[in-house]
Regions:
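Rhodanese-like catalytic fold shared by cysteine-dependent sulfurtransferases
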Residues: 1-34, 42-82, 91-128
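Active-site flanking residues adjacent to catalytic metal/cofactor-binding acidic residues
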Residues: 37
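Short, surface-exposed ligand- or partner-binding patches at beta-edge/loop junctions that are enriched
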Residues: 86
Length: 128
């Protein structure tokens, strides 16, 4: 059986999903229809907060929650919506963004890591 390494999966994801800079992210957020998705674990969100206006969907649930016919889908995403995905360091978000592309979503981007966002001056809010 041929298997892929995690490194190979990340390389593939990073080739398909653009990782945005902070400035590119802010431009999309301010000027387009954008959904920000936090794929970190509940404890990470609880302890550190969340990017302002982001939706929390843990990495392990993203494919289930964002299916168009899912009764648990928290957001309406159309073809014009930009989807920005982030985690703690940019690895889980790369894999999650690749999964969203595989599901047929368009305009999916890797926002990178939460700490990177905070260090760049990005707005956050406590987990609500």
């Amino acid at each position: 059986m041929q298997t892929k390494t995690l490194e190979a999966l990340l390389i593939e994801a990073n080739e398909l999903v653009k990782r945005l800079s902070y400035d590119e992210s802010i431009d999309l957020i301010n000027n387009t229809q954008t959904v920000i998705i936090d794929v970190r674990e509940e404890s990470e969100v609880y302890n550190l907060g969340i990017i302002k206006n982001a939706i929390h969907i843990p990495r392990g649930l993203i494919e289930f929650k964002l299916l168009p016919n899912s009764p648990n889908n928290p957001v309406l995403i159309n073809d014009d919506t930009n989807i920005l995905v982030y985690c703690a360091g940019g690895y889980r978000s790369a894999l999650a963004a690749k999964s969203l592309l595989d599901l047929g979503f368009k305009n999916v981007f890797n926002l990178g890591g939460f700490q990177e966002w905070v260090e760049s001056g990005g707005e956050i809010q406590p987990n609500v």
